Amino acid sequence: MAQHTVYFPDAFLTQMREAMPSTLSFDDFLAACQRPLRRSIRVNTLKISVADFLQLTAPYGWTLTPIPWCEEGFWIERDNEDALPLGSTAEHLSGLFYIQEASSMLPVAALFADGNAPQRVMDVAAAPGSKTTQISARMNNEGAILANEFSASRVKVLHANISRCGISNVALTHFDGRVFGAAVPEMFDAILLDAPCSGEGVVRKDPDALKNWSPESNQEIAATQRELIDSAFHALRPGGTLVYSTCTLNQEENEAVCLWLKETYPDAVEFLPLGDLFPGANKALTEEGFLHVFPQIYDCEGFFVARLRKTQAIPALPAPKYKVGNFPFSPVKDREAGQIRQAAAGVGLNWDENLRLWQRDKELWLFPVGIEALIGKVRFSRLGIKLAETHNKGYRWQHEAVIALATPDNVNAFELTPQEAEEWYRGRDVYPQAAPVADDVLVTFQHQPIGLAKRIGSRLKNSYPRELVRDGKLFTGNA
């Protein structure tokens, strides 16, 4: 694999020499940092099993190497990456996999280790969505996830990835993560804090990642991280699990943050060792039981993961001073909900008791039941999935609901050819050789729902959202 030149500040190299265990080679560290990062993907098991995915993609000649800490994760090698980017493959467009760095699959593996089965989870710094979607898959779209993102521009990307993967159990918020300890104390069974950090571990992906690096900056970031982990710990219920992770390598932003929390709440913090998380995990194990992953150990990004349990309640923080405002939705009455459910089933949309119908004006939404306890405590950017808009003739079903709720075995499902599916993703109407009989058509490709179409004569009218429409070369190779 080709080398690339990474910028290393001298002070950073000195710091790494001191931080690296004697069992590891500093020369190996430098060599690993100069190698470009291996590509990796995670199969979205909400849509397809790993076995079926491997069978589906077998004809492509992809080399898929299992990632030891994630059963559905694979390093991927492809011959035609330049000809067809991974993000333009049919399987990616329909949400069958997520392009995710292997190291970043570690925190969720830690969160669900030892049979942990949380019902209400918070992802404090969620964008672009790799870990939120991984959490949802581990929960099988049940329970509820609060996915927060401080950056307004990244909330939109977060929602797009959640929608593409067919996820229905997520509520999105846009807050500084330091508010949650006061706003929602002891409300969560598990919390992932993948903290903002100095990014020292990402040089294999970005050779200039350390251009603005300084020891002083690390100290400032660590101060913010301490405030974030303190807030997250307050939001965690007694007995709950908190996973703290970063993509950086210095101890000040990693071990020291966790040790600070332990010193602050000595009777309430229990470190849960990660040495048995996967075969070979002990190679990165610290004396506290954390995983400090230098890039040469597993040939991946540098990363840090700690898991801890809250063993008892801690003193509450002062109540927040902000006002949430009125919640603009109201629950749909049982009789009407039954009528809506019946109409939705007619076009192949079905849901279970984990989701409940709510209404705002002419909009119908499905919210995860597990998030209802947070209504009135935080302001949501987006909650659950938009099911439909009502109009005089019935319902206008929404694309995100089709992707999350439809099953391809519906009587109105219509399988497209590769060329027709590509036209669909380009936002164009489709003219199949033999048009379906039904007026409302569940459009599928590779037996996966990709949208809902209206049949007008021999034409299938495209309803693919404009913001998702793709240009350029797609999976058939035609531009």
Curated annotation (Swiss-Prot):
SUPFAM superfamilies: S-adenosyl-L-methionine-dependent methyltransferases (SSF53335). The active site is at 247 (nucleophile). Coiled coil: none annotated. It catalyses: cytidine(1407) in 16S rRNA + S-adenosyl-L-methionine = 5-methylcytidine(1407) in 16S rRNA + S-adenosyl-L-homocysteine + H(+). GO terms for molecular function: RNA binding; rRNA (cytosine-C5-)-methyltransferase activity. One of its GO terms (cellular component) is cytoplasm. Its main location: cytoplasm. It is found in: Cytoplasm. S-adenosyl-L-methionine binds at residues 125-131, 149, 176, 194. GO terms for biological process: rRNA base methylation. PROSITE patterns: NOL1_NOP2_SUN, SAM_MT_RSMB_NOP. Keywords: Cytoplasm, Methyltransferase, RNA-binding, rRNA processing, S-adenosyl-L-methionine, Transferase. Its EC number is 2.1.1.178. NCBIfam families: nop2p (TIGR00446), PRK11933.1 (NF008898). Specifically methylates the cytosine at position 1407 (m5C1407) of 16S rRNA. PANTHER family: 28S RRNA (CYTOSINE(4447)-C(5))-METHYLTRANSFERASE-RELATED, NOP2 YEAST -RELATED NOL1/NOP2/FMU SUN DOMAIN-CONTAINING. Belongs to the class I-like SAM-binding methyltransferase superfamily. RsmB/NOP family. This is Ribosomal RNA small subunit methyltransferase F. It comes from Shigella sonnei (strain Ss046).
